Amino acid sequence: MAKTIQAIRGMNDCLPTQSPLWQKLEGAVKNVISAYGYNEMRMPIVEMTHLFSRAIGEVTDVVEKEMYTFEDRNGDSLTLRPEGTAGCVRAGIENGLLYNQEQRVWYMGPMFRHERPQKGRYRQFHQCGVEVFGLNGPDVDAELIMMTARLWRELGIDKHVRLELNSIGSLEARANYRTALIAFLEQHIDVLDEDCKRRMHTNPLRVLDTKNPDVQAILGDAPRLSDYLDPESTQHFAGLCELLDAAGIEYTVNERLVRGLDYYNRTVFEWITESLGSQGTVCGGGRYDGLVEQLGGKATPAVGFAMGLERLVLMLETLELTDVRRSVDVYVVTAGEGTMMAGMKLAEQVREAIPGVRVMNHFGGGNFKKQFKRADKVGAVVALVLGENEVADNTVVLKDLAGGEQVTYSQQEIASKIAELI
């Protein structure tokens, strides 16, 4: 026997028993976003490597250690997308969607990062991202946060997530803060671990969200980013907080929140849960007003967020919020000469008469007992039974699989009777 081939580590199958919960989540996400008037974009999962190095930052963990990069036959360096914003901006510039225009878009699909697989963190994972281009006020920042808050309510997890906010200011303000932070860290060089020492000169703001408790202890005395904010960023952040207060959305200002990608400025935010252990961030985003210009477009304000779908599925499972629509409503049982095609025609008739109904035909033969057992296994509510007599009389037996009651009806009236039961 040939050796079986396994899935790549950190890249998981979504099995038929798991997909209904995914479909429920994806449906809720699409419904909420659509309620705000946003339109879907679909971008390739493979992009030129320099798109991500320019957008995300050469010295970020994503670019340095986590990207799946390969050379194609033309010698071009290509990368499986590790996130969606850079590709969305590239598509907007390339297709002339951003210059002097307002765009509100969303996308959903797989992303790839070569990380150590663990609960809630995978090498292929799925994100839904929402991006707004052409608006620079705190009102649109607030709308995105309100959108996510609405989604949490729809999913029933709003009591299990909390919002953290910060403003990291303009590029100029952050450069001044960076100088002060490096000077502080150099005074405590003996406390820093190797990762923090490396980041100190390449990406010092990332030291602020270190998980090392010894480094965390000294950061209480570190310079405060809020003391270095430019007046415009301070005013923008105050406006955002006022809008969230008016909307009744609770939040905590976390001055160590900086996000892991270099393109952010001003507003940054994360939704965090305690339900998933160490992988607590389920959604994060912020402003990236310089990214469009950085990637070759005209200066365009922008803001967005992304949420990890695997982590949301894991949350729903952890909180036992897994009620999903059954995959089959009606099971068609047949036995006897010429009944198979009659059963298939009847199933089509029911599908046409009841929008959204799910009808499964039994294939493979077997007696009634075997077929009813299969109907129970797939979770059907009712069975339609066709034998030779029913086909001849143009009737069908409708069996309630929960109570066991069965009644014979004409095939013309069967759809209305099914609708009453499901």
From Swiss-Prot:
Keywords: Aminoacyl-tRNA synthetase, ATP-binding, Cytoplasm, Ligase, Nucleotide-binding, Protein biosynthesis. NCBIfam families: hisS. Coiled coil: none annotated. The keyword Calcium does not apply. GO terms for biological process: histidyl-tRNA aminoacylation. It catalyses: tRNA(His) + L-histidine + ATP = L-histidyl-tRNA(His) + AMP + diphosphate + H(+). The keyword Cytoplasm applies. SUPFAM superfamilies: Class II aaRS ABD-related, Class II aaRS and biotin synthetases. Belongs to the class-II aminoacyl-tRNA synthetase family. PROSITE patterns: AA_TRNA_LIGASE_II. It holds the Pfam family tRNA-synt_His. This is Histidine--tRNA ligase. Its main location: cytoplasm. One of its GO terms (cellular component) is cytoplasm. The lineage of its organism: Bacteria, Pseudomonadati, Pseudomonadota, Gammaproteobacteria, Vibrionales. Its EC number is 6.1.1.21. GO terms for molecular function: ATP binding; histidine-tRNA ligase activity. It comes from Vibrio vulnificus (strain YJ016). It is found in: Cytoplasm. Homodimer.
